[in-house]
């Protein structure tokens, strides 16, 4: 029985530290130092939440830039079912899926170049990716320009404005946040 008391007191102490003090401390510090990020990086217009800067959305209309395909279950960009398709590179089903995506993109973008950017046909590991390269966004300019009656130059400038450089120049590549880019497109129409 003597050995039980130190074990039990250690258990209670660690439970309070790891189950109470540590989570409360990290939450408080996160809210203090990074309030926007700690609350989901929500994009707001007035009192309305339009999306998150971290999670893609299913933009399908011709007047919107399309992001990476989503591999989430039940519906595209379902944050509760985050994950990749789990299809191996050697799986013939993946080849069929990519071929179908390429055909659909070529049909929706007849004025674009023949080479479809790879990130427009392959899902990310999370299935929720909201970023594509500026080149993939530029590939879609003819379709978006035609649907919105905007010039290629206007859309090129918009892509450049919403392009984000990597934190370290030689690691990574520039990306465009599709949610922010499409919300900016909607503001042009207002």
From Swiss-Prot:
Query: Where is the protein found, in the record's own terms?
Result: Cell inner membrane
Provide the alphabetized UniProt keywords: ATP-binding, Cell inner membrane, Cell membrane, Ion transport, Membrane, Nucleotide-binding, Potassium, Potassium transport, Transmembrane, Transmembrane helix, Transport
InterPro entries in the cross-refs = KdpC (IPR003820)
Superkingdom of origin organism: Bacteria
Q: What GO MF annotations does this protein's record show? A: ATP binding; P-type potassium transmembrane transporter activity
What is the membrane topology here?
A: Single-pass membrane protein
Family under the similarity heading: Belongs to the KdpC family.
Q: Can you say what this protein is called? A: Potassium-transporting ATPase KdpC subunit
From what organism does this protein derive? Answer: Escherichia coli O17:K52:H18 (strain UMN026 / ExPEC)
């Amino acid at each position: 029985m003597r050995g039980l008391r130190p074990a039990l007191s250690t258990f209670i102490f660690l439970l309070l530290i790891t189950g109470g003090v540590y989570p409360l401390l990290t939450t408080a510090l996160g809210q203090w130092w990074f309030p926007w990020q700690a609350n989901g990086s929500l994009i707001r217009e007035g009192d309305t939440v339009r999306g998150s800067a971290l999670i893609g959305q299913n933009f399908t209309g011709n007047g919107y830039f399309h992001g990476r395909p989503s591999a989430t279950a039940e519906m595209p960009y379902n944050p509760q079912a985050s994950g990749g398709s789990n299809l191996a590179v050697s799986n013939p089903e993946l080849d069929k899926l990519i071929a179908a995506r390429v055909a659909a993109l070529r049909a929706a973008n007849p004025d674009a170049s023949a080479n479809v950017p790879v990130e427009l046909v392959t899902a990310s590991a999370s299935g929720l990716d909201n970023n594509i390269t500026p080149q993939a966004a530029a590939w879609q300019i003819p379709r978006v320009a035609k649907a919105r009656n905007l010039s290629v130059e206007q859309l090129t400038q918009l892509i450049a404005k919403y392009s984000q450089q990597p934190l370290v120049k030689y690691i990574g590549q520039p990306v465009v946040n599709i949610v922010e880019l499409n919300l900016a497109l909607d503001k042009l129409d207002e």
